[in-house]
């Protein structure tokens, strides 16, 4: 029954903005970074510096701190909006499938969309690096190793789970697109300020992903554990509340 509900939720994504944003959001970051790198290419060539490490670092930081929180907010709001717009909750919850399957299915889809966007970000950045090299053959990009990119993005993917789960709960708890978007934007702004503090940034859900990139190995491991455990607990509580709540 669960997999049937999950498949149904996946089919709802067909031709939706939520699906398109998986491509659009990371590509915006990649294009901006490509433009910045191209503008400074002549300086980098003269200095003989390998531009791949800073290119990867700024791409990850821009995505994690700015675009990813907006992406998560938009995706959760759009997925909840599939039911809110047409007031489909009553008919959806009248189906024989247990309520928890609906909550968990939408959460799994949200996480999958985020991780898919991360894959697009990695592939597109590699493509932009090769394009940059073809335009400026003298530009040093080294061997363009994947480990400095993939490993941090894996940490980001895991440490973002707590923020995703909270935003998912907010989007389903209040059937207002404005509430969900407003909450997400406020959380993003607070996260930008909180990340400056090693104490607050290591616990605030929207700061965890960027702290997982900036902190040392021991800090990264602790942040990942906090995010994953917190996500499991929050998802359990949110699902329990969703099952018990009267939704109209």
Where in this protein do the model-derived segments appear?
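Aromatic- and glycine-rich beta-strand/loop motifs that create alpha-glucan
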Residues: 1-26
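Pore- or pathway-lining transmembrane helices of multi-pass membrane proteins that form conduits
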Residues: 21-27, 174-191
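Secretory targeting signals
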Residues: 27-74, 104-168, 172-174, 213-216, ...
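Terminal transmembrane helical anchor/hairpin motif
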Residues: 35-57, 61, 181-248
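Transmembrane helix boundary and interhelical loop/hinge segments in multi-pass membrane proteins
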Residues: 74-91
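Transmembrane helix-loop junction
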Residues: 82, 95, 130, 134, ...
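Short helix-to-coil transition segments within interhelical loops
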Residues: 93-99
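Alpha-helix N-cap/helix-start motif at helix boundaries, enriched for small hydrophobics
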Residues: 101-104, 242
């Amino acid at each position: 029954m669960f997999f049937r509900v999950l498949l149904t939720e996946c089919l709802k994504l067909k031709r939706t903005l939520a699906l398109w944003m998986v491509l659009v959001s990371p590509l915006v970051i990649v294009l901006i970074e490509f433009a910045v790198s191209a503008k400074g290419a002549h300086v980098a060539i003269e200095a003989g510096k390998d531009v791949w490490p800073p290119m990867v670092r700024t791409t990850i930081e821009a995505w994690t701190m700015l675009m990813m929180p907006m992406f998560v907010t938009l995706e959760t709001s759009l997925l909840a909006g599939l039911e809110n717009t047409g007031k489909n909750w009553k008919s959806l919850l009248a189906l024989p499938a247990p309520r928890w399957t609906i909550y968990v299915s939408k959460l799994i889809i949200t996480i999958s969309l985020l991780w898919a966007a991360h894959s697009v970000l990695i592939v597109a950045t590699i493509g932009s690096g090769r394009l940059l090299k073809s335009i400026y053959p003298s530009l040093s990009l080294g061997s363009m190793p994947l480990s400095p990119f993939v490993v941090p993005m894996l940490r980001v993917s895991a440490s973002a789970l707590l923020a995703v789960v909270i935003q998912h709960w907010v989007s389903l708890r209040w059937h207002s697109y404005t509430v969900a978007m407003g909450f997400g934007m406020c959380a993003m702004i607070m996260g930008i300020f909180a990340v400056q503090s090693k104490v607050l940034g290591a616990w605030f859900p929207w700061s965890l992903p960027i702290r997982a990139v900036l902190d040392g190995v021991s800090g990264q491991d602790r942040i990942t554990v906090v995010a994953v455990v917190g996500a499991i607990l929050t998802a359990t509580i949110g699902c329990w509340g969703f099952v018990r709540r009267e939704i109209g």
